[in-house]
Every structure is written in structure tokens, then in C-alpha cells.
């Protein structure tokens, strides 16, 4: 049974022939390519659907070339692929993820996925985080559908070798609420890992590392596709993220507290009778 992948971040000049040739250059054969266009203007919406002979072929292609340089693209771009459901309900089954650190630059999405899936069949995918120039930041994420396998991987693969040139560093990745606006196309499983807490400057804390729990924060946005309206993808910027642990200025907080306390004290004292001069002083008459 044929299966399709969603492909995004396309330039207007990238037509069906261009997409087919790009996959062929990577050693992949596609059945067909459907460029999605705006119904009113006819202008390409920036994404397409690529059909393969079967689900296994599509899945293999996804893990093999997703994130790799797109042949012939000017300016330089990378394959941005995902599963496509064409309006069907996305898979809402639980997912359990791990943060994978200390990755060397040679590790890509496919290598990360293959390293785990060969031992843990429930591994759903892997993603190496890249900087704007396409260079690995040295860490990534892997997702599982089986929590027990996620926990096994955390224990059994901690410090393991064989993925790049360094032992891997693992930690549980804890999801945070997604703030992605709804868009008009869908992926069954999202591999967009670009939304993280960014409140500090150092390596771990910059990506949501909790030194108390030894965990990282991430978010997997979900999308929905409908045939009625075509709309391009909107990236969520850093302004949509929250600092989960803002710094507290203790000195300023104490100053504000004391000022409020003094105002309250003065108000309470002003509402009392003034003290008498002596014990024998006459009590003032009521006004």
C-alpha cells in the first residue's frame, strides 16, 4: 500500500521534477510528488506530499535523509520531512523521549534513530538539533512509544559508545505545553524539536536542563491538514517561550515589603486614640 511523506520549506522554483530528482540523487525512488498551491493565487504554499511504494519505504527514507542537504537547492536547504495523514486524526498515543547529549558533528538523524531502534523497537524517531547554518549543536532527542523501553535505554545506553566519537549522555526529556499556532497541513508524528526553554547561556541550562531533576524540557508541536484551505507553516520564535525559573532580586523584594509594612503600620496607628499626658488627665469629649 502506497504511503506519503510531507515535505516542507520549499522555494517557489522547486517543482515536481526538482523534488523527484532530489530524492533520486539521495538514492530514493518516489512514485509521485504533489505540490500544494494556494487555491486563489495558484502560488505554491511551500510544501508538498511525496508518495512512496509502501510505508516501509517511506519510513526508511524519512530516517535516512531527513535533515540532510537538499541537492540543487539555492540557497542551501535541507530535507524537511515528516509523516503525512491527509486530514486523518493524528496518533495521540503517549510518547516518551530522551535527551541525547555529547553528539559529535558526524551524527545525523538517521544514525541517532538507528542506534536506538535496533535494540528498542518502540523508538519512533530521532532528531539532532542544528544551528541556523545547519551545523549540529551536539545534542538531540529520541522518542519511544513504550515507557519501559525508554527507561531501559536511559539506563543501558548511558555512556554507551558507537554513536559518533564520544560516549552518549542521556537524560529524560520532559514535555512542556506547546504554543504552536494551528496550521493547515498534518504530520502523524512531529519531528520538529525547535521549541525549548532558553533562559540561560550555558550548554545544559540553555535547553531547559533542570539540575535538581536531571531532566530537559522540549515540545513536539502537532499540526492538522485540511484540503479546504492551504496555509504555510509559521515558526514559533523565542518570544513565545517562558522562563520557568525567573531570577528574584531579593534586595528589591525586601525593600518593597518593608515599604508596604510601614504604610500599614502608620495607617493602623493613625486610627487609634492619642495617649493621655498623665494618669489624671481628662478624657477628651467625643467630637
Curated annotation (Swiss-Prot):
Q: What is its main location?
A: nucleus
CC terms in the record's Gene Ontology section = cytoplasm; nucleus
The reply on keyword Nucleotide-binding is no
The places in or outside the cell where this protein is found are: Nucleus; Cytoplasm
Q: Which Pfam families match?
A: RRM_1, Trnau1ap
Task: Provide the alphabetized UniProt keywords.
Answer: Cytoplasm, Nucleus, Protein biosynthesis, Repeat, RNA-binding
Q: Which GO terms describe its molecular function?
A: RNA binding
- The RRM domain covers 3-86, 96-175
| Record GO biological process | selenocysteine incorporation
InterPro entries cross-referenced by the UniProt entry: Nucleotide-bd_a/b_plait_sf, RBD_domain_sf, RRM_dom, SECp43_RRM2, TSAP1, TSAP1_C
Question: What is this protein's function per UniProt?
Answer: Involved in the early steps of selenocysteine biosynthesis and tRNA(Sec) charging to the later steps resulting in the cotranslational incorporation of selenocysteine into selenoproteins. Stabilizes the SECISBP2, EEFSEC and tRNA(Sec) complex. May be involved in the methylation of tRNA(Sec). Enhances efficiency of selenoproteins synthesis.
Sequence similarity: Belongs to the RRM TRSPAP family.
Subunit details for this protein? Found in a complex with tRNA(Sec). Interacts with SEPSECS. Component of the tRNA(Sec) complex composed at least of EEFSEC, SECISBP2, SEPHS1, SEPSECS, TRNAU1AP and tRNA(Sec). Associates with mRNP and/or polysomes.
Report the protein name in the record.
tRNA selenocysteine 1-associated protein 1
Q: Which species is this record about?
A: Mus musculus
- Chain's gene name: Trnau1ap
Amino acid at each position: 500500500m502506497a504511503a506519503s511523506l510531507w515535505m516542507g520549506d520549499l522555494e517557489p522554483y522547486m517543482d515536481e521534477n526538482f523534488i523527484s530528482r532530489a530524492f533520486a540523487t539521495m538514492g530514493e525512488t518516489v512514485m509521485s510528488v504533489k505540490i500544494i498551491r494556494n487555491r486563489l493565487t495558484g502560488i505554491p504554499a511551500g510544501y508538498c506530499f511525496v508518495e512512496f511504494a509502501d510505508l516501509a519505504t517511506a519510513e526508511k527514507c524519512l530516517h535516512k535523509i531527513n535533515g540532510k542537504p537538499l541537492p540543487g537547492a539555492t540557497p542551501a536547504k535541507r530535507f524537511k520531512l515528516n509523516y503525512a495523514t491527509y486530514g486523518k486524526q493524528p496518533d495521540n498515543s503517549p510518547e516518551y523521549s530522551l535527551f541525547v547529549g555529547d553528539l559529535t558533528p558526524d551524527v545525523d538523524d538517521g544514525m541517532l534513530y538507528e542506534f536506538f531502534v535496533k535494540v528498542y523497537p518502540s523508538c519512533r524517531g530521532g532528531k539532532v538539533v542544528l544551528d541556523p547554518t545547519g551545523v549540529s549543536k551536539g545534542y538531540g532527542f529520541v522518542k519511544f512509544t513504550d515507557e519501559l523501553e525508554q527507561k531501559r535505554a536511559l539506563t543501558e545506553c548511558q555512556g554507551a559508545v558507537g554513536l559518533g566519537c564520544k560516549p552518549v549522555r542521556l537524560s529524560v526529556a520532559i514535555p512542556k505545553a506547546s504554543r504552536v499556532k494551528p496550521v493547515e497541513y498534518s504530520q502523524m508524528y512531529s519531528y520538529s524539536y525547535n521549541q525549548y526553554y532558553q533562559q540561560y547561556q550555558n550548554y545544559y541550562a540553555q535547553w531547559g536542563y533542570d539540575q535538581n531533576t536531571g531532566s530537559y524540557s522540549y515540545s513536539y508541536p502537532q499540526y492538522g491538514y485540511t484540503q479546504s484551505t492551504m496555509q504555510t507553516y509559521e515558526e514559533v520564535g523565542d518570544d513565545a517561550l517562558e522562563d520557568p525559573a525567573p531570577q528574584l532580586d531579593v534586595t528589591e523584594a525586601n525593600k518593597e515589603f518593608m515599604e508596604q509594612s510601614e504604610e500599614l503600620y502608620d495607617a493602623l496607628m493613625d486610627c487609634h486614640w492619642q495617649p493621655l499626658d498623665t494618669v489624671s488627665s481628662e478624657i477628651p469629649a467625643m467630637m
